[in-house]
């Protein structure tokens, strides 16, 4: 029993270190907080019938977020919520002023500023492939003594490793890169919960 308790305490300590050091701002918006601001969705996505001003329900839900969900409110106002919502940044930024809450953008700057330089993130699972290099690739000049190529193109032949096809004449193909929406990271709390279940199963 004491081994399991010490294992659980060690896991909590290990999982709490990256969380305390990083405080990712995107994790501050939960689905329940997004439900709270659902009256504002029509306004910040430019799909409301009113279009020019938010409803009183929207402003009230915005005020309720200032007490317990300022981080989420800042993400909504800046248009960087971690959900797939087509937020119009211009109308989202104007939302606090339209609701007569002019201090919200200043509070958001103070709230977001420390999270601008997080430490290295520990992710579990596939990560995005690196982007293209900034230095342009300059092809080497071809020597003049080469034999002339025929005008007909050669057909593509599959490579030995079965990967992407290549051509005999030096042509290249590119592999599709992983998009941010297809990349994922495993939540530390989910990892902890899974390990705790395994530990309890063998107890």
From Swiss-Prot:
Gene, per the UniProt record: LTPG20
Region forming the signal peptide: 1-21
Glycan-linked positions: 46, 50, 88
GO cellular component, one term: plasma membrane
Transmembrane segments: none
Disulfide pairings: 29-74, 40-58, 59-99, 72-108
Region (Disordered): 119-182
Keywords attached to this entry: Cell membrane, Disulfide bond, Glycoprotein, GPI-anchor, Lipoprotein, Membrane, Signal
Functional description taken from the UniProt entry: Probable lipid transfer protein.
Lipid linkage positions (GPI-anchor amidated serine): 172
Organism from which the protein derives: Arabidopsis thaliana (Mouse-ear cress)
Stored SMART domains: AAI
Protein name: Non-specific lipid transfer protein GPI-anchored 20
Taxonomic classification: Eukaryota, Viridiplantae, Streptophyta, Embryophyta, Tracheophyta
